[in-house]
Amino acid sequence: MPRRRVIGQRKILPDPKFGSELLAKFVNILMVDGKKSTAESIVYSALETLAQRSGKSELEAFEVALENVRPTVEVKSRRVGGSTYQVPVEVRPVRRNALAMRWIVEAARKRGDKSMALRLANELSDAAENKGTAVKKREDVHRMAEANKAFAHYRWKSLRSFSHQAGASSKQPALGYLN
């Protein structure tokens, strides 16, 4: 296979009801067996319930919940001299959203409520209040990165250069040891 050029990321069509690309991605992550209309109805129903509980608009409430679950750092395995180290690295912006959405959907699927729409609404509302399984997952990932910050100097250069190519902001990383 030729390795000459990098294929660009595909543009995703915005959500038909709210016009949000983020929400369209969320629907795609929730979708099972290609049943997009089912996934859309679950998400819209959950957002409606969430908006009634929070008193905010559907999109605003979703954004708050997502913001509370987005990780800023994670650990990646790096093999150095026969031993494997968990090296903390900053998470790229696109991956932050993807991880947060994936964690929310996983947590909602594990809940014991009646319908998936209700499970999703409850998980999103917990995330908006900084509690719940998805937020706990983010805290665990951050705790792992904090515990392994001694290995931050094992980061490889390709990650740093990749984060700048991906359009990451030039501001300081969330934790000081990643400089």
Curated annotation (Swiss-Prot):
Keywords: Ribonucleoprotein, Ribosomal protein, RNA-binding, rRNA-binding, tRNA-binding. GO terms for molecular function: rRNA binding; structural constituent of ribosome; tRNA binding. SUPFAM superfamilies: Ribosomal protein S7. It comes from the Bacteria. GO terms for cellular component: small ribosomal subunit. GO terms for biological process: translation. The keyword Ribonucleoprotein applies. InterPro entries: Ribosomal_uS7 (IPR000235), Ribosomal_uS7_bac/org-type (IPR005717), Ribosomal_uS7_CS (IPR020606), Ribosomal_uS7_dom (IPR023798), Ribosomal_uS7_dom_sf (IPR036823). Part of the 30S ribosomal subunit. Contacts proteins S9 and S11. Belongs to the universal ribosomal protein uS7 family. One of the primary rRNA binding proteins, it binds directly to 16S rRNA where it nucleates assembly of the head domain of the 30S subunit. Is located at the subunit interface close to the decoding center, probably blocks exit of the E-site tRNA. PANTHER family: RIBOSOMAL PROTEIN S7. This is Small ribosomal subunit protein uS7.
